[in-house]
């Protein structure tokens, strides 16, 4: 397919998905610095919230350094051209959170559900559309549903009022042909005016290849993060994606040099550890496990003596999905007992 001249919208995840490896502890200064760099580089849409979306601050998901209100009210007034989005997971975020984000100047809301549970998004998508927001349905863990199944779920979200639907590879499990199959099927089923997006992770180092495959199959919104800062082995690295798009003639509107500088000079120094395809992140992609489980599994390894890799494989076998973080500890405890490892009461 000829992609030269095709325009796409790149959507930055550094300040939302990037909160996972930061344990949601990014400072306001760090947020400001990165957001202003992204804005100056020409990134049109920047997501800002707790890693698990609006209202994510909790014992289950982790308490952030600042509230969603503080992060959003700090970043939004500084933006010269970029718009700011927020993620919302029904059951974590509420319509009140949605209203708060709208009042602070968030223009895009992304309502995220597991890829078989679009029906739980109706209230939030409907509310966002009534507020006149750019309203996105976000189908997570898309490898756990067939192309036909994703079509049904995407059409539900479109019917509730979503003007864009995302196929989301939360585990970094999909390969380019699987991305193409899913994106092409959803594209064919949605109204022509409904936009289609893809969100990739780099656990099998396929983030960029999968994103290009998605564009080839009809996606026009693509998620990425500067230096890949995100759950697991990170998101699709923005600076690499932009460079590849430039080579292919795909128009992103992002400056290829400035985004490299944001990644290298602003984001890499923020990292508490290198975001790379290490043994455990690779296991996420191989076993199809939700990306933000990685740090929980590493913590459980220290506590219970079960290698994170073994735990992640078991979580994949059990079909655990986003929102079941509390089950990671339970699974580790069960495995430790089965292996005769003594665990302190």
UniProtKB/Swiss-Prot annotation:
PROSITE patterns: PYR_CT (PS50991). It catalyses: (S)-4-hydroxy-2-oxopentanoate = acetaldehyde + pyruvate. One of its GO terms (biological process) is L-leucine biosynthetic process. It comes from the Bacteria. The record marks 16 as: Transition state stabilizer. Its EC number is 4.1.3.39. Disulfide bonds: none annotated. GO terms for molecular function: 2-isopropylmalate synthase activity; 4-hydroxy-2-oxovalerate aldolase activity; manganese ion binding. The active site is at 20 (proton acceptor). This is 4-hydroxy-2-oxovalerate aldolase 3. It comes from Comamonas testosteroni (Pseudomonas testosteroni).
């Amino acid at each position: 397919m000829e992609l030269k001249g095709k325009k796409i919208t790149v959507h930055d995840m550094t300040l939302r998905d990037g909160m996972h490896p930061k344990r949601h502890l990014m400072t306001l200064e760090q947020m400001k610095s990165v957001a202003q760099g992204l804005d100056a580089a020409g990134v049109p849409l920047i997501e800002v919230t707790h890693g698990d979306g609006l209202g994510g601050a909790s014992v289950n998901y982790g308490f952030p350094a600042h509230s969603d209100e503080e992060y959003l009210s700090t970043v939004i007034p500084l933006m010269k051209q970029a718009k700011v989005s927020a993620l919302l997971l029904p059951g974590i975020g509420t319509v009140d959170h949605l209203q708060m984000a709208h009042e602070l100047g968030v223009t895009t809301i992304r309502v995220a559900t597991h890829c078989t549970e679009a029906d739980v998004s109706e209230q939030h998508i409907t509310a966002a559309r009534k507020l006149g927001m750019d309203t996105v349905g976000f189908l997570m863990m898309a490898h756990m549903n067939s192309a036909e199944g994703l079509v049904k779920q995407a059409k539900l979200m479109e019917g509730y009022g979503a003007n864009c639907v995302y196929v989301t590879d939360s585990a970094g499990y999909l390969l380019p042909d699987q991305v193409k199959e899913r994106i092409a099927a959803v594209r064919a089923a949605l109204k022509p005016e409904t936009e289609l997006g893809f969100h990739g992770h780099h656990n099998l180092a396929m983030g960029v290849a999968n994103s290009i495959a998605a564009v080839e199959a009809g996606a026009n919104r693509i998620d990425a993060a500067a230096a890949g800062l995100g759950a697991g082995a990170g998101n699709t690295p923005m600076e690499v994606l932009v460079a590849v798009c430039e080579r292919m003639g795909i128009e992103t509107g992002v400056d290829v040099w400035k985004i490299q500088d944001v990644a290298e000079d602003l984001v890499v120094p923020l990292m508490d550890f290198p975001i790379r395809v290490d043994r455990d992140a690779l296991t996420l992609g191989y076993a199809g496990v939700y990306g933000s489980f990685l740090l929980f599994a590493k913590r459980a390894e220290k506590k219970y003596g079960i290698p994170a890799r073994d735990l992640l494989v078991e979580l994949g076998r059990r079909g655990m999905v986003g929102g079941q973080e509390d089950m990671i500890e339970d699974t580790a405890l069960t495995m430790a007992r089965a292996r005769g490892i003594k665990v302190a009461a």
